[in-house]
Amino acid sequence: MKTKLTQKQIRFQALLLFFITFFLAELCAVFLYQNQLKEAKLKADYTAQTTIGRVKSQLNHYLAESNLMKHMIEAGYTVDDEEFSVLSSLMQDDQNVIKAHELAKDGIVTLIYPMSGNEAALGLNMLEHPARKQEARLAKESGEYTIAGPFELQQGDIGALLFDPIYTTDANGDQTFWGFSILVLDWESFLNEIELDTLEEAGYTYELWKISPATGEHLSLIHISEPT
């Protein structure tokens, strides 16, 4: 009788030990999974913030190029064709993201560098052009730079336009809209510079989007939902 009772106790203890071990193993697995998930989220957040920072850094770099001409005009300096060409040539970047630099007095493109290959944009009224007017008008009204596109450029290829509004100030301190300093950006080169492909290579899904100034709608520019 004692032997049978001892065997039952052993079986019970073995079964109890099994369930305890199984429970602890499951608990450890859940703990490890949660830690891995937390690390993955932190890594994804860091990667996203790094990418956002890279985009902002690139845009600030391009804006600095545009601001040189902007500040000269705001200071009352009249830029002639030769000076515009010389200064604009210094703005061209090694990565060929900046395809052209334009000045648009009263919103109408009057100066372009380089002119070769960009003749089709000369005389274009940015405040009235169907595909450009929303961002151009927003820049004029807000006093802040806006980016239009990507779309097919007048010159061909796909690009985006950075509108940097220029205002002159009279003796009374009143500001008057002068026009725009415009950078024509090569879209593919811009994407290469901000290295979005690294997100896809790392297995992330992502979307690059903007708010339509005309409708306020969410407009998707790039959407990767199935990374390779």
Predicted regions, residues:
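Short, Lys/Arg-rich, polar N-terminal cytosolic tail immediately upstream
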Residues: M1-L5
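Residue-identity detector for glutamine
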Residues: Q7-Q9, Q13, Q34-Q36, Q49, ...
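Juxtamembrane extracytoplasmic/periplasmic/luminal helical "stalk" adjacent to the first N-terminal
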Residues: I10, A14-V79
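Intrinsically disordered, low-complexity polar/acidic regions
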Residues: K41, D45, A75-L221, S225
